[in-house]
Structures are given as C-alpha cells and as structure tokens.
Amino acid sequence: MEEYTEGYLRALGQFRGSRYDNSFIVRIHYARIRKAGPDCQFRCRCLRDGKRSQQLQAEAWEGKCLVGTLQVELLFYGTKVNHTREVGLQMRGAGPPEGYGPWRSFSPEQVAAFARRTGDANPIHQGKRPVVPGLLLWQSLLARLGEPERLHMVFKAPVHGGEMIYIREEQVNERNEREFASV
C-alpha cells in the first residue's frame, strides 16, 4: 500500500485565508507508525500560533490509533523572507555545490496543477515564476525515497518553478538511515 499523502494535504488545507498569503513553509517533519490509507481519518491542529509563524500538525488516525503525523512550520510574510526579489537558490551561484547531483525541477505548470489540486491559493505559487510548494517537494521526495518512516526537511530559500533541485545523500548512522540535503 502506498502512503495516502493526499489526506495530510487536505487536512492542512483547512488553514487558509488572507493570513496565509505569501507565507512560506520553513520546516516539515513527517513520521509514521504505519502507512496511512484513504480510509484513515485526517485531522489538523495548530500546535503553535505566533505573530510571525505558525506550527500545524496533520494527523492520520485509524480508529483510535494515531498512525502518522505531518508537522509544518509556516513563516508569515515579513522582512526575513525573500519575497520581492524573486531570487531562488540557483540564482545565487553557478551550479550545485560539490557532491550534489541533479534531482529534478518542477515546471510552473506542475506547480499550478498542484496548487489547483490541493486548493492552495497562496499568491507565491502562481504566475510565471512561482515558488514550488514545500508540500509538493515533500510529497515528491517521500516517493523518491521509497516512503521512509520519517522525513525532516528544512527550507532555507525558495525554489522557483523551472529551477533544478540538487541533492546529496549521506548515511547518518549505524542503522543506515539516510539523510538528503538539497539546494
């Protein structure tokens, strides 16, 4: 059975409105006991609600058993986030850092299709040079890794539609758990 990621996305989708316009996901943490299926009940709750940021947690429940969580930390529009200059990671330097290889890029059309499918009305995910949604990156990387039980992602700068994303894989402990870094 494949992980039913759509349930997590729909649960997070209940948090919408003008407050979320131009907000960025800065961190995602996913963990599961077992894969959530379409029969699970998905809920979302706010763990922390601040003036500049918010932490949300989507949960997958099978009966009375919590089977998975997806935590998302949002940074609301402010001076610390690069909104207006439209500089992505690859515009900061030529080529990937040493040891990184190409993973993939997302076209503006793919970004728009994801936004339509999930009901994402954030203006940064629209237009000719949209920012790739963090949840699209999460969903794609989760599939690429073979649906690991845990995945932690930190976003240091926006990635725009059409920009190549580069990753590096590392073994991080004696259990051969993998860590991926991307730029």
Which ranges hold each PLM region?
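A conserved acidic, glycine/proline-rich C-terminal tail/linker
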Residues: 145-164
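Hot-dog-fold acyl-thioester-processing enzymes
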Residues: 1-34, 79-150
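Residues in well-ordered beta-strands of folded domains
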Residues: 73, 115, 154
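HotDog/MaoC-like acyl-thioester-processing domains
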Residues: 2-6, 23-100, 159-183
